[in-house]
Structures are given as structure tokens and as C-alpha cells.
Amino acid sequence: RIGHAYLFCGTRGTGKTSVAKIFAKAVNCEHPVDGSPCNECETCRGITNGSAMNVIEIDAASNNGVDNIRQIRDEIQYSPSSGKYTVYIIDEVHMLSIGAFNALLKTLEEPPAYVIFILATTEPHKIPITILSRCQRYDFKRISIDTIAARLSELMEKESIEVEDKAI
């Protein structure tokens, strides 16, 4: 079951926005493979290159006013022109003003079935509890260098690619 609001928390560079875009692809992909996006259909390519009309990325650091959120509230009345869902990715959501959070709350309380909100933040403690309680929260952590190196080694072996240990 797909929720209508997600909160991705973690320090910079942990992949919150990247995962949000992959999720947007997964729910809208025309030819999913075992629940994963194909990355080849028109929808997946549009999300990758930023031209998809049904995936809207908003930087709350520069669009933090109540009018910005009210505009979203007006836009969500229209179903997506392509794909099953309209996905709003609101990055640095903790930067919203109190008024903007209140407007967002109204939107999160009764969203249309075809809208998904993904809120991303480095500072979840700055988000009102009323917003937190309406989201499924996921905490992102940095992956250690050793874990990355082990995975790279595994992939090189699987693909029969010879590589020096120093290169990994």
C-alpha cells in the first residue's frame, strides 16, 4: 500500500532526494520490473531529466511562504496528466514558515488519492508534530566506506571485472 505522505530525514548527502525520485519513478513507471522502475519508459526518462509534469520538486529554503503551499493546494485538485500519481518532493521542509506548515497540514489531512508528498529534511526536530504525525518517517544514514568498498568488490566479481584492491 502506498502512503500519501513520507518524511525522509538525514544529513546532507545521504540520498533523500535521490530516493524520492526513484520512488516517484517506481509509482509512475509504465513498465515496472518487480516493483522497480524500468528507467527506460517515457515517464522514467522524464523524471530523470526533470521534465516530468507529475513530479514537482520544491526547495522550501527559497519557497517557504504560505502562498507557495497554497499554490500546491490549488494544483493538487487536478489529476496527473501522465502516470498514476503526482509526487511533490519538498526539500529542506524544515525551512517552511509557521503559516506554510499550517497550509501544508490542511493539504496533508485530506489529499487526493493520486497525490504523494515526500518531505525531506536535515532537521526533523523543526517540523511541527502535527505534520510528523501524518507522515511515514524514514531515517537515512551515511554508508561507511568499508560497506561501499565491499559492495563494489562484490559487483566487480559478479560482473567478472578485474580490479586492483587499491582502486576500490
Describe each PLM feature range.
Residues 1-133, 137, 147, 153, ...:
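P-loop/Walker A NTP-binding region and its immediately flanking N-terminal helices
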Residues 141-168:
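Conserved C-terminal "switch" segment of AAA+ ATPases
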